[in-house]
């Protein structure tokens, strides 16, 4: 088992549902975890598919919660958005954008291919300083509450297995292959350097 704990980041588009569900479960299991979004804005479902609620990443979960409570308490209670924001504000004050974080991680898990591409592109555009490797793995998770929960448990199980490897660099590919077979999902994987 590695001497230092695995530093994990979970990234989705708006740092609301998928990454926060995984953040919640991983932190309860004792992982050193942070979560992020890669979007230019935070988007939450609105009264119609073409009318999302759009916020700046500086907006707190509490402010979003109160805004939606004021707009339509019944709608946002019924569709689970208020419940989700309530959970989020217990974890951290506001969503964070991956591109603004300069912390180093051992493992970055993304929740969809577009986000994976954005994370890899961002890491590759940074100036390499330490040459420390970071594994970026994509686990496709649909953006709804049920799939976010299932995906979070899968991510947690994957992190626990990686945490217990003797040699992450040499064992991760085999581990991901086992997870693909077990879960029926395909994982994208690449290594970037800090």
Curated annotation (Swiss-Prot):
One of its GO terms (molecular function) is RNA polymerase II CTD heptapeptide repeat phosphatase activity. The keyword Transport does not apply. It catalyses: O-phospho-L-seryl-[protein] + H2O = L-seryl-[protein] + phosphate; O-phospho-L-threonyl-[protein] + H2O = L-threonyl-[protein] + phosphate. This is RNA polymerase II subunit A C-terminal domain phosphatase SSU72. Its EC number is 3.1.3.16. It comes from Rattus norvegicus. Keywords: Coiled coil, Cytoplasm, Hydrolase, mRNA processing, Nucleus, Protein phosphatase. Interacts with GTF2B (via C-terminus); this interaction is inhibited by SYMPK. Interacts with RB1. Interacts with CD226. Interacts with SYMPK. Belongs to the SSU72 phosphatase family. The keyword Iron does not apply. InterPro entries: RNA_pol_II_suA (IPR006811). It is found in: Nucleus; Cytoplasm. One of its GO terms (biological process) is co-transcriptional mRNA 3'-end processing, cleavage and polyadenylation pathway. Residues 160-187 form a coiled coil. It holds the Pfam family Ssu72. GO terms for cellular component: cytosol; mRNA cleavage and polyadenylation specificity factor complex; nucleoplasm. It is an enzyme of class 3 (hydrolase). Protein phosphatase that catalyzes the dephosphorylation of the C-terminal domain of RNA polymerase II. Plays a role in RNA processing and termination. Plays a role in pre-mRNA polyadenylation via its interaction with SYMPK.
């Amino acid at each position: 088992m590695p001497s230092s704990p695995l530093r994990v980041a979970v990234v989705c588009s708006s740092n609301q549902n998928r990454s926060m569900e995984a953040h919640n479960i991983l932190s309860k299991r004792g992982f050193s975890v942070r979560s992020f979004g890669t979007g230019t804005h935070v988007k939450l479902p609105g009264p119609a598919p073409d009318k999302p609620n759009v916020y700046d990443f500086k907006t707190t979960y509490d402010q979003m919660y109160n805004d939606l409570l004021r707009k339509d308490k019944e709608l946002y209670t019924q569709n689970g958005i208020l419940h989700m924001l309530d959970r989020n504000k217990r974890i951290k004050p506001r969503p964070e954008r991956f591109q603004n974080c300069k912390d180093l991680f051992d493992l970055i898990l993304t929740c969809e291919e577009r986000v994976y591409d954005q994370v890899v592109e961002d890491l590759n555009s940074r100036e390499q300083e330490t040459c420390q490797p970071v594994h970026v793995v994509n686990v496709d998770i649909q953006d709804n509450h049920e799939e976010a929960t299932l995906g979070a448990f899968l991510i947690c199980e994957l992190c626990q297995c990686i945490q217990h490897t003797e040699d992450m660099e040499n064992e991760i590919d085999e581990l991901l292959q086992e997870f693909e077979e077990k879960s029926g999902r395909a994982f994208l994987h690449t290594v970037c350097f800090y």
